[in-house]
Amino acid sequence: MSQIINFRQLAQLYKSELLDRVIPFWLNKSQDTEFGGYFTCLDRDGSVYDTDKFIWLQGREVWMFSKLYNTVEPRQEWLDAAIQGAEFLRKYGHDGNLNWYFALDREGHPLVEPYNIFSYTFATIAFGQLSIALASAAKGGHSAVRVCGDSIAAEKLASEYASIAKRTFDIVLSKTDNPKGRWSKASPGARAMKTFDLPMILCNVALEIESLLEPAFLQKAIDDCLHEVMDVFYRPELGLIVEALGKDGNLVDCFDGRKLNPGHAIEAMWFVMDLGKRLGRPELIQKAVEICLQEVEYGWDKEYGGIFYFMDRLGKPRHELEWDQKLWWVHLETLISLIKGYQLTGDERCLTWFQRVHDYTWSHFRDPDYPEWYGYLNRQGEVLLPLKGGKWKGCFHVPRGLLNVWKILEAIQNS
């Protein structure tokens, strides 16, 4: 299989799509030049259809522009876009104590209380990655940056943003046993469950802000989340990762307890591969690759192609009406995991599946007429919603996926 893939040509395809079509779309269409922050509810052509602002997506867009600045090239327009989004978040995104709201109106007034732990995690990586960009800018001779029309020392701003990232991360870790806190809708004494999504995200967050953390603190955070992902939520008897367990770590026969989310599991595996590389643990990388392949095989729709959104570990009906839809992020994250697995292990199964998922993803999610990609397809692979952004889809999974796959393909070619 490796003999028939032109890695150089494929890397150029991903690079061009990212830099020529996707990033210009968000740079030009999403920035709110009047009130700050970003519009994410963008129709097929980039026109704004709703002006509310969701903290998940605000933080993710800050992170994305910062990551591009740090890993592709230090373009001023990317840094400026990240800073203006971060300043909107710093001013309006939390309650004054870094409890991050879920949603704001266009001007920054809170709409939804800070119940959602992932608002905190995405704020963490946003301010963490931007602090790294600003520190780099300061070292590169850009001693000052423009913030709301004022000139501010880049080093000072980097320090302030790093502090926000670290303090927010501390709050996240303090909430792992009860993520929603006082905003939980569960009845006291109700069925006690824990979910896969938080330890999964923490695997990524820990590496994103690694340079800001004390080594011992970082190591404990990594050890804890790796244990949860690989030893608790991964069930060898199923060969799969489950989305929720009882607090005691046992399987529970209820809707939440039977739920499988192949995309989540597959995405988590490239986080684990990164940690395995960082820790020098090839056996961890190999285990992550095996789980990734098992999840792709299990989640693949053998009739219509693509990966199911939700599944049930006992084959029972799901209550989510969207269970059989094909979503953009699932497929982008799968591409990252598969090509990273091939890069790190040389396992040809990863390359075979990568080609298959690549073909499906590019032929179904990419809009040939307008930039950015569709997010939501029905089971048959037809476009359900022509939007390019909304309450859950923003400047994140498509550009992050394109960036990662481009860089990995380039590295494979160069090696």
Where are these regions (language model features)?
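Glycan-recognition and catalytic cores of secretory/periplasmic carbohydrate-active enzymes
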Residues: 1-415
